[in-house]
Amino acid sequence: MDSVEIIIRAKQKDLNGKVEIVEHKAQGSYGCKGGKHYIRYMDKHLSPKEQVPTVIKLGDRELTIIRQGLVSSRQSFILQGETRADYHTPYGTMELVMHTHELSSEFQESQGSIHLVYSLEAN
């Protein structure tokens, strides 16, 4: 796996239409195996107590985010599909429902990008 700088830009819109734009940077690693792209990094923005190991696995029409640590979950996003996941935190577990509207990616020799648009319900 190659060392990479990871930049995550997120635009979040709540039910009232309020938009918040967030950007996080991390050092991580990238590799491709069996036609799937893997990005690994330590997420320091999910918990004030510890960094959370995070893996992004990208296939043709599916993206999976796997977190294992103080916060743990396995969220899958399937293009034009609905998926469910349990999101475990020290404060309890939430059931998440993701509706994936757009999923695309572009990888070149020295850089890549993933574009994901989804709506989220938390129960």
Model-found features: residue ranges?
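N-terminal intrinsically disordered, cationic/polar leader segments
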Residues: M1-A122
